[in-house]
């Protein structure tokens, strides 16, 4: 389990930093694509990707904003959906989702979660696709404390069961309960929050 706080970014040189960040992301995605390989395990699971020490040093520049996950499927898995859940006005809302049919045994996804938005990358042997959710409508700016948790170990995938990948919570209370990624984030007391979840289904989705 990883628990962390949010540090407000320094606005000086923000434009140059955005260009550097984009270049680093492109390099990381190319490396992730090359490193994506077949796995002989038959059980379905998702886990944090393993990278070399040099690549981990590059990832550290993103200040815990991005995480790569390796996924293994079996023949029962037909489709997947990744959803963005946002807490506002006392309720959790599904603000966005991306779904597709599964045509490969292994894959990799990357999630970049910031205080204001979320980017999702799906990566396989054919390349990568980016999905952007540029606005997260939840009042983190009103929170006195922000923390979160994300997958830090191998987690089994069960068909048609939602798996939280990354949860970030804000609170105005004097203390915050320690979260585990297996907890139901919807039961957490908070004033702001965003969660990224994965659901694998045994039914194909309609192509659009």
Regions found by a protein language model. Give the residues of each.
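C-terminal motif of bacterial Sec signal peptides marking the signal peptidase cleavage site
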Residues: 32-35
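N-terminal export/targeting and maturation segments
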Residues: 38-104
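Bacterial N-terminal signal peptides that target proteins for export
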Residues: 15-24
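Short, Lys/Arg-enriched N-terminal segments with co-localized hydrophobic residues
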Residues: 1-16
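Extracytoplasmic electrostatic interaction patches
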Residues: 99-208
